[in-house]
Regions:
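Conserved AdoMet/S-adenosylmethionine-binding subsite of the radical SAM
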Residues: 1-125, 129-132
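C-terminal accessory extensions appended to soluble enzyme cores
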Residues: 108-182
Length: 182
């Protein structure tokens, strides 16, 4: 949040949008899946601060990894965080992950490092598939869409991308300078 003052200045003149991923409701699992980023709880604090400052936010709900973070409780927890934080939209390309050749082998190997034996389950169920959807994909997508619809959160990717491309001017134009004291 060290750039909050700059984001606020931008948002006064046009539209600043803060985007981030949320993959898991649980900080412990977050540290395993995303070891080099801040935890989910910290990201939620950022989203809430952005809401306080009236800076719109977009969450990327991806990747959803079968048998790891595809539990209904996880999805509902993330969505509740998003509702409370007042996010503008949630981008989701389906309840799964895509694995290109080369990435797949690396991913399956990495699975066994953290979740011993899980790669065998993936190989048996998905093999060389490019799209790896959760077995609960349809149910999870229904929960996702209904929660977003009821909360007034954008969830259709075309609508979100159109929103992201629209930059209305809110005040007179002026170029921000490194030397401004404002």
């Amino acid at each position: 949040m060290r750039d909050l003052d700059l984001l606020c200045q931008i948002n006064e003149r046009t539209k600043a949008v803060v985007q981030m991923t949320l993959t898991t409701y649980d900080d412990k699992l977050c540290r395993i899946l995303e070891p080099n980023v801040c935890t989910t709880s910290r990201r939620i604090q950022v989203l809430q601060k952005m809401q306080e400052e009236r800076i719109p936010t977009i969450v990327w709900l991806t990747p959803i990894l079968p048998f790891i973070n595809d539990a209904e409780e996880n999805l509902k927890g993330i969505l509740e965080y998003c509702v409370v934080a007042g996010v503008k939209g949630i981008v989701n390309f389906g309840m799964g992950v895509t694995l290109r050749e080369g990435n797949r082998e690396y991913f399956y190997h990495a699975l066994d490092q953290v979740f011993p034996g899980l790669s065998e389950k993936y190989w048996n169920k998905y093999g060389y598939d490019y799209v790896i959807n959760s077995p609960n994909s349809k149910h999870l997508l229904h929960i996702f869409r209904e929660t977003c619809r009821k909360a007034g959160i954008m969830y259709q990717t075309d609508q979100i991308f159109d929103y992201l491309k629209d930059f209305p001017e809110k005040s007179e134009y002026w170029q921000i300078s490194l030397f401004d004291n404002k």
